[in-house]
Amino acid sequence: MLPQEKLDLILRRYDEVSARLNEAVEPALYVQLSREFAGLEQVAAAIRDYRSQMQEVEGLAAMLADPTTDSEMRGLAEEELRDAKERLEALEHQLKIALLPKDAADERSAILEVRAGTGGDEAALFAGDLFRMYQRYAESKGWSVEIISANEGAAGGFKEIIAEIAGRGVFAKLKFESGAHRVQRVPDTETQGRIHTSAATVAVLPEAQEVDVEINEADLKIDTMRAQGAGGQHVNKTESAIRITHIPTGTIVFVQDERSQHKNRARAMALLRSRIYDEQRQKLDAERAADRRSQVGSGDRSERIRTYNFPQGRVTDHRINLTLYKLDKVITGEALDEVIDALTTHHQAALLADSESGGL
């Protein structure tokens, strides 16, 4: 049985926040309350559905316990009670999932970084394919995609591309995409029909706010330079490109896509903030990992998480042994949700097992 006192507290808080949102409050407080309301809304609905079903089960059980209930009604009630108990069990599971502790960053926008790995030109082309997959997926969700920095490959694709994906719940959807992605296919330049293997790495960082990370100007080394195009040639005459080094952590960011130095600096600072915030989160996660079974994969960015085999039309996620023979739909973003939803379900099941065994 679920702790009813805890459920009562959640419903009371939901009503309080709902009432506060209808009052005149400071803009900053309104944003804070709106976020809390969004988190409580799903849980409150799950509690009400569960309790409504519980009442139905209790009503049918009372009918069966009543000696005045005739045999025909008793037979109907027994059948309905079996169905009602099954529905109650499903709703209880859904409620337990809704009550699991949330990642504080789940509702945030995200920084997506895709880098070509081993495989030369083919790796850069694959990095381009991955970026377009996420771009199309984001567009299907109504999120916006803005490129922060891009370094194109000689034959196409990208050696590295960094973008901001803005929208509600972006990080929750994309956070399990971090890791090494491998592709197996016959390159266009391959005359013998041999399958080549190449790789690209993906990093998904929750977008950090200024309040999340304190950065002192004294800890920064800022270099300006002229932006460069493919092959290293200078593409403008002003020193608009920015490289910022955070001395305490050794984190370096470089942005040159905008013609304005001011805009490049703002983007570089936002990227730096998100990287430092992500490093802090990873450190905390690593400290907790020894006591938890809930992590999908090791969380290591170098871990090979997925293989895209073009000759077989196959996508395999190695962390949960998921194989889909619909690579054409996954690589266009159309069926990416099938992979993401399976990873999320696996993660939630592990979290639930942890909580029920006292692991959380």
From Swiss-Prot:
Main location: cytoplasm
Pfam families named among the record's database cross-references: PCRF, RF-1
Positions of region (Disordered): 283-305
UniProt keywords, alphabetically: Cytoplasm, Methylation, Protein biosynthesis
UniProt GO molecular function: translation release factor activity, codon specific
Post-translational modifications: Methylated by PrmC. Methylation increases the termination efficiency of RF1.
PANTHER family cross-referenced by the UniProt entry: LD18447P
Similarity comment text for this entry: Belongs to the prokaryotic/mitochondrial release factor family.
Protein name: Peptide chain release factor 1
Gene it is expressed from: prfA
